[in-house]
Regions:
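N-terminal signal peptide c-region/cleavage motif recognized by signal peptidases
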Residues: 13-19
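Sequence/structural signature of beta-propeller domains
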Residues: 20-331
Length: 331
């Protein structure tokens, strides 16, 4: 009996870790690429479309966010200084927080801003990976941290999320009304978390964790020295009631149900982003920022100051056309 139970556990673990070879996906078409000048810390880690303005954050800059001037092919980042108040306690354990603090002295950026989003009136919301917290930067008034119930982090960790250094919250999306937020946990395990604000406190409405999954998957064939690596989420966007997850390890984005997080359809951007002249001598996908609109997708790269094959070192934003039939198209 014991040997049978042990065999079952081994089989389950094998299923969890066996590399998956993805089915072919429709390729998105690249229509423009824009280097970004003026980001002090480089490392573009989040994008948001607020009305007709594109905003960006860097995971190296704690005291400013960026409005992007997109009138020319080379975009100019215009800094908006922000006075960030002390970060509230989120429930992350001391070990994770201390490692993050130590890393900030080396790389800069104690807050580690990894995503930005906007509600319908233009308030901006920025997720701090280091602290599992969300900062609101209103159109008028001082920035403030959202009051999030500690049960959110407890539930996420109980589901296997937020357990590893530098693998915490990596993306954020908010509904137009400004009362529901979705957060992506990056990897090992990756997941989607949702919280709502009935009054002043953001809390779970039912389960916080919509998705928690492990597993590894082969990188696309265009990747030099492609290998099996952990599935990940590097950003999330909300468009017409659907979630779109940026999955940089596999160079894809996927449409998901906003309630269940179930996958509905995925598209690849590997063919154009991994064209020889656009490749980086880095072993992982660098896409970290996503905006979806009717016309297509904006995808931003955090290149860690590393050059592309053609020598370009600045942060990049790529524009991909929407797929045939639009983002709501069925397979």
């Amino acid at each position: 009996m014991r040997s049978g139970f042990a065999l079952a556990i081994l089989l389950f673990c094998a299923l969890e870790t066996a590399p998956v070879v993805a089915e072919p996906k429709t390729e998105l078409s690249l229509i423009a690429e824009h280097p970004v000048e003026g980001m002090r810390g480089g490392n573009l880690s989040g994008l948001a479309l607020c009305g007709d303005e594109l905003w960006a954050v860097s995971d190296r800059d704690d005291d400013q966010i960026y409005l992007l001037d997109t009138r020319t092919a080379t975009w100019q980042a215009q800094a908006l200084n922000i006075d960030v108040p002390p970060v509230p306690e989120s429930g992350l354990p001391w070990g994770l927080r201390s490692r993050t603090k130590a890393a900030s002295f080396v790389r800069g950026g104690d807050l580690d801003f990894e995503g930005i989003t906007c509600d319908a009136v233009g308030n901006r919301y920025i997720v701090s990976e280091a602290h599992a917290a969300v900062l609101q930067v209103p159109m008028a008034g001082a920035p403030q941290w959202l009051k999030i119930a500690p049960g959110m982090v407890r539930e996420a960790r109980a589901s296997g999320l937020l357990l590893h250094f530098n693998a915490l919250f990596e993306g954020v999306a908010i509904n137009p009304e400004g009362n529901q937020i979705w957060l992506t946990a990056e990897r090992e395990r990756r997941g989607l978390v949702s919280i709502k604000r009935p009054q002043s406190l953001w809390d779970c409405d039912g389960p916080c964790v919509l998705l928690s999954e492990a597993g590894i998957e082969m990188q696309p064939g265009q990747m030099p020295k492609a290998k099996a690596i952990s599935r990940n989420f590097s950003d999330v966007a909300l468009f017409k009631g659907k979630l779109f997850t940026l999955e940089s390890s596999q160079y894809q984005l996927c449409r998901r149900d906003a309630v269940t997080a179930a996958v509905e359809r995925c598209w690849s951007f590997a063919a154009d982003m991994l064209a020889p002249q656009r490749q980086y001598d880095q072993p992982y996908g660098l896409a970290e920022a996503l905006v979806i609109d009717d016309g297509g997708a904006w995808i931003g790269l955090d290149n860690n100051f590393g050059p592309r094959a053609d020598g370009e070192k600045r942060p990049m934003v790529y524009r991909f056309a929407a797929p045939a039939g639009g983002w709501g198209a069925q397979p």
